[in-house]
C-alpha cells in the first residue's frame, strides 16, 4: 500500500472550536460567498437536513439561534500549516488537497503491515483527536481516499483495490459536492453500479 490519505472532516468547524472551545455544544454555521451570495461552507454535526453550498438565508429558516461565523481562511491556513509542518518533518512527499485532505506517499517506507501500523500511529498521534481524523491506505490516491472515508474517526483502514468490486462503492465516496450527492441519492443512485446502469441521458438531465 503505497499511498495514505488523511481526511480531516469539517476542518473549518474543528478549527473554530479549537479557537473557541466554549462553542462545542452549539449549532454552528460557517458561511462564505459564492457569486456574491452567502452560502454555508461548513456546519456542526448537530445540524441536519442541509449541505455545504446551501444559501445561508434558506438554512436559517429551519434553525433556531445558531452561532453564525464568517469563514476565516487566514486562520484556517494557520491551523493547517501547523499540521502540514508536523507531517513534513516525518514524510517528505505530501500532496495537499484543500483544507480537509492530504495524500502521503509511503511507498519508500511502507514494506509490510507492521510498517503501515507504525505509520498510521505516527500520523494519528500528531493530530488532536478533536479533529476526528480519518486515515486510509491503498495503492493509489483515489482508492486511499475511499479507504479513508470508510475508516472510523481516529483510526485507519486498508483497502485492497479490486476493479471488479468497484460497483459496490457507495456514492458518498465520490469527490463531488454534498448537494450533488443528495440529488443522486434521491434518484436512487446509491452506489457505482447503479450509476453505471443509469441511462446516460437521464444522468445528464
Feature locations, PLM:
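Flexible, active-site-adjacent loop/turn segments at secondary-structure boundaries
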Residues: 39, 48, 144, 164-172
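Residues that scaffold, gate, or flank divalent-cation-dependent active/transport sites
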Residues: 1-103, 108-110, 114-117, 122-124, ...
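Generic, well-ordered alpha-helical scaffold segments in large soluble proteins
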Residues: 62, 86, 122, 126, ...
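Flexible loop/turn segments at secondary-structure boundaries
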Residues: 37-38, 143-145, 202-203
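Short, well-structured beta-strand/strand-turn elements
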Residues: 66-69, 93-96, 133-134, 190-193, ...
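Compact, charge-rich alpha-helical regulatory domains located at protein termini
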Residues: 150-205
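Short, well-ordered loop/turn elements at secondary-structure boundaries
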Residues: 1, 24, 129-131, 178, ...
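Structured, non-catalytic alpha/beta "coupling" segments that mediate domain-domain communication
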Residues: 114-155
